[in-house]
Regions:
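Alpha-helical hydrophobic helix detector
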Residues: 22-37
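Membrane-proximal N-terminal amphipathic helix
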Residues: 46-73
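Conserved catalytic segment of histidine kinase HATPase_c domains, centered on the N-box/ATP-lid region
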Residues: 43
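N-terminal signal-anchor/signal peptide hydrophobic helix marking the start
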Residues: 14-24
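Periplasmic/extracellular, small/polar-rich flexible segments of pilin-like filament-forming proteins
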Residues: 67-175
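N-terminal leader/signal peptides at the extreme start of proteins
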Residues: 1-16
């Protein structure tokens, strides 16, 4: 008798009942309702962190260009501020105050969008985000008032990084 009872008990304990399955599905649904908004916010935080990281990289690169300009014995009366020796490919042009302005021989700190693109690619590493004045790029470039404005294009928030070639200051707005 005990052998028969043991066999029938084993058969009964295989698998889940319908109530157990429904209970697990309900619990998973409740967890999804509470955790989904948290994970959705992670994407926005990732975009913000990306912008902050690029802003920091740009600020560091601008400071390194300026430090190299000072290390080269500037400021002096030497009007030639083209092709900064000792930095990158040697094609960075700087203003009278040692801030990067272009890679094509222009030292005027009042920037236009094309020169802003040149500065971006001239001072940042080759793995930097893609910038241009139009198109589907990481940052869209403009130069209102002579400052470089790099507007983040991946989340349509309008967040931006601003470079002032007069002072070397990097600021930004994250929305």
């Amino acid at each position: 008798m005990s052998i028969t009872k043991s066999i029938s008990t084993r058969r009964m304990s295989k698998g889940f009942t319908l109530i157990e399955l429904v209970t697990v599905i309900v619990i998973l649904g409740i967890l999804a309702v509470f955790t989904l908004p948290r994970f959705a916010n992670v994407t926005e935080q990732a975009h913000d962190a990306s912008i902050q990281g690029v802003k920091g990289a740009l600020a560091s690169s601008v400071a390194i260009v300026h430090a190299q300009w000072v290390a080269n014995g500037q400021p002096t009366a030497d009007p030639n501020r083209d092709n900064l020796v000792g930095f990158g490919r040697g094609d960075i042009d700087v203003s009278a105050f040692g801030w990067p302005t272009s890679t094509n021989g222009s030292n005027n700190p009042s920037m236009d969008a094309i020169r802003c693109v040149e500065v971006w690619y001239g001072i940042l590493q080759s793995s930097a985000p893609i910038v241009d004045t139009a198109g589907n790029v990481d940052y869209r470039v403009s130069a209102p008032g002579g400052d470089c404005v790099y507007t983040y294009n991946r989340d349509n928030s309008g967040s931006n990084i601003i470079y002032d070639a007069d002072t070397g200051e990097i600021t930004g707005n994250i929305f």
